[in-house]
């Protein structure tokens, strides 16, 4: 059997950003409106700093406005909530993202709930979570949305397919399951307590791995020809002391069985920022009561 088709997230996300750039230009020309994304970073976490820099760069590249607010790690919770309140009221800001994790003295849920749901481009606010569950027009979390776009690009219509989502986090697992239900898949949500996890995975046409355990899902768990979306990003140390990024799927064995698979890195990762920009554009159009943006 030949190796699985590689699902190239870099290529797809680049095309999506091109489309977003064109839609932003159209919005500016027709309505004199420029979408704006505000990113708030509290503290000095190195990984978060890289993410924020990349988000800012990509935002500007698409023709949107980028507003960065970098706060010291000891910023009081009230001060952060006041900043969010001012961004909620700012007509030039259409998307608000607070980079997670925040320092321990700040209540993450309180921060999420302080963001105007119409500007919640992470899709974490309970209003957006509820709308997604009810099948309404929600701003959808970026990683599940990116995963869904890759799936639809690879498979076309998803209706009737059996899908397993391994992981039940609020950020990936739960919203991913809701998106697949909306696409008329038959969805199983599996996790650490699932009995016979390999057997459950083996029945699935679509496997979404979002469990946060390096290379946990083995090739012999996968149904031949299945499509595998690996959301995991884990840094492991090799015997020679060097470090390597791997997913939640054992790529070397899975690539020999699956029909299509996302690599790590270069699969789902690049889609996350592209979908953040997509959400910002969608939020901007809705806030200004413009027609829904087509991608």
Swiss-Prot record:
Disulfide bonds: none annotated. The keyword Amino-acid biosynthesis applies. HAMAP family: THF_DHG_CYH. Keywords: Amino-acid biosynthesis, Histidine biosynthesis, Hydrolase, Methionine biosynthesis, Multifunctional enzyme, NADP, One-carbon metabolism, Oxidoreductase, Purine biosynthesis. This is Bifunctional protein FolD. Homodimer. InterPro entries: Aminoacid_DH-like_N_sf, NAD(P)-bd_dom_sf, THF_DH/CycHdrlase, THF_DH/CycHdrlase_cat_dom, THF_DH/CycHdrlase_CS, THF_DH/CycHdrlase_NAD-bd_dom. Belongs to the tetrahydrofolate dehydrogenase/cyclohydrolase family. Pathway: One-carbon metabolism; tetrahydrofolate interconversion. NADP(+) binds at residues 167-169, 192, 233. Pfam families: THF_DHG_CYH, THF_DHG_CYH_C. It catalyses: (6R)-5,10-methylene-5,6,7,8-tetrahydrofolate + NADP(+) = (6R)-5,10-methenyltetrahydrofolate + NADPH; (6R)-5,10-methenyltetrahydrofolate + H2O = (6R)-10-formyltetrahydrofolate + H(+). GO terms for molecular function: methenyltetrahydrofolate cyclohydrolase activity; methylenetetrahydrofolate dehydrogenase (NADP+) activity. It comes from Paramagnetospirillum magneticum (strain ATCC 700264 / AMB-1). The keyword Hydrolase applies. GO terms for biological process: L-histidine biosynthetic process; methionine biosynthetic process; purine nucleotide biosynthetic process; tetrahydrofolate interconversion.
